[in-house]
Structures are given as C-alpha cells and as structure tokens.
Amino acid sequence: MTEMYDITIIGGGPAGLFAGFYAGMRTAKTQIIESLPQAGGQVAALYPEKMIYDVGGYAGIKAANLAKELEKQTRLVGTEIRLNETVVDIQAQADFYHVKTNRNEYDTRAILLATGNGAFNPRKLAVEGLDHLEDKKIYYHMPDVEHFENQDILVAGGGDSAIDIALMLEPIAKSISLVHRRQQFRGMERNVQHLQESTVKVMTPYLINGVREAVEGIDVDLKEIGTEALKATHFDKLIVNYGFTSSNKIIKGWEIDLTQEHRMFAVDSLMHTNMKNIYAIGDGVEYPGKLRLIATAFGEGPIAVNQIMNDLYPGKRGPVHSTSMFEK
C-alpha cells in the first residue's frame, strides 16, 4: 500500500526546508523530495562558500552552513527528507495526489512546490575545446576556497555573485582580477563599493576571447569591447560566473496543469495555485510585490502550511510557538 502524507514538499532548498520544519511543528506528516544529492538547493550546490548576509539572526553565514542548519532544524520535527530523488509525475485523484518519482511512489493530501528556478546549468564560455579543463583550471561552480589559495585567479562576470566570489577570495589568493564586458557592474551598490575599496584588479570593458592551457595555469586573451585590441594575460585558474539558464521543463511532463506567469507559479496571498491543495513558495512563484529573498521565502512557508492545515483539518488547533514544543 502506498504511504499517505499530509504534505509533500517538492524542493529541498531554504524555502522547502523551513516549510518542512514548520509543517512538522503543526504535526503534519510531511516529506521533502529533493533532486540534488544534498539539501540546500541552488545556493548550497553552486556557491557553498558564499556568505549570505540577508537572513535574520546571522551577521553572515556560509551558504553550506545555512543549508546544514536548516536541514538539522527540519529533522528535529520528524519531517522526512528524500535526497537524490526527482518527481516525474503528479496525478490528481479524488481527494489526494499520487506522486511518482524516479525511485518510488507516494500519496499525499497536499503538495507544496518549492522548486525555485527548476533545473539550472551554468552559462559557459563561448570558447571550444575547454571541457577537459573544467573543475581543474576553469570553474563554473565554486568548490572549497582552499582550491585557490596563493594563486593568481581571474573571475569573469559582472553581477553580485561574481563580485562576491572576488571579494571572498581576496584574502587567500595571491592576486584576484575581475573581468566584465561593461564599464558598470550589475551588483548592488554596497557590493560595488566594497569592490572599489578592495585590492581586486578590475578589468573593464573586456570579454574573454580565447583560453589556452599552459604548462602551469592558463593563458587568457581579453578583447576590449568596441575595439580590436587584445590583451594577453596569464592566471592559475579561471572562475566563470555568467549566470545560469534555468527551466521547470520537468513540470511539463506532470499530469496536473498549473497556471504560470513568466515561467513562475501564479499564487494568491495564501500561496495557493490554481489547483486544489497545491501551494507554491520561494523563487519559483509570482504575485504582486514578490521579493526573491531567502527571508521572504521563510515567511511564505508558514503561510502555505497553515492554509493547508486549515483545509485538511478545519477543527485542528492553530499555529503554535516553537518554545511550547521544545522547552518542556
């Protein structure tokens, strides 16, 4: 017999993990299904060393550490976390949903989508023949910072993440350079100010025109935008941060038909989608005034969970405070 859950949360990033914790506080039988081999979502998978400063209660915390703390918090209340498992179909039944994954099948009374931007892949350099250098001399994901200690590093990109990486490596690298194809950076004003005050060498407006493996490190040709001028440079390693292409293509294979706006799930003020007992939170939703912050997602989770519990168990006791559960 297929196991029945009150709430199945699809997505184990910060939004899904905190919603799973709160669902456990409401004593809902809850599971989280995450396609990646670790909890924490895109931030933890792609930028584990990145510092996060906009989560309440932390002056600053590494993405990997935030993910670990959220996972630990979620497991405290008995919420099950299923890693490395992908939802391949959701079928509507009379008063529940049948969820099929690549590994198992489950029944659930309600679904909470916390899928973020869906599957994501890095935008790579437009230079052929570099695959053999990936994760050796060219990086599209951030490994442990120790990989870059006492080395000459080039970071390519113009957004907040590229600036964050350059500033994070500044204290440990031999030298840090940041190349961007525009004169102005797209980062937040405070980040750009920190960059200007740092020892990071900024090279603008340049585009990477060629990369060649050297005996030690790599040779990088930079082309100045608007001219034919080329600059020959040499670095030990290159970190490319051109952003990511994302899609929720897997959802197109599901039997249920969810309304989307600009490839995001359309929800109301209670995080409800167009389908009964299916809710959505986090970066993958759209509503008036939506802010794509982890802190915002932390608030959306309890709103959705409380509404689910009101729908499933109208007579059940309402929200509780955490101290009433853990201080006994």
Curated annotation (Swiss-Prot):
GO terms for molecular function: ferredoxin-NADP+ reductase activity; flavin adenine dinucleotide binding; NADP binding. It catalyses: 2 reduced [2Fe-2S]-[ferredoxin] + NADP(+) + H(+) = 2 oxidized [2Fe-2S]-[ferredoxin] + NADPH. The keyword Ribosomal protein does not apply. Keywords: FAD, Flavoprotein, NADP, Oxidoreductase. Its EC number is 1.18.1.2. Its cofactor is FAD. The keyword NADP applies. It comes from the Bacteria. It is an enzyme of class 1 (oxidoreductase). FAD binds at E34, Q42, Y47, V87, F120, D283, T323. Belongs to the ferredoxin--NADP reductase type 2 family. Homodimer. This is Ferredoxin--NADP reductase. It comes from Pediococcus pentosaceus (strain ATCC 25745 / CCUG 21536 / LMG 10740 / 183-1w).
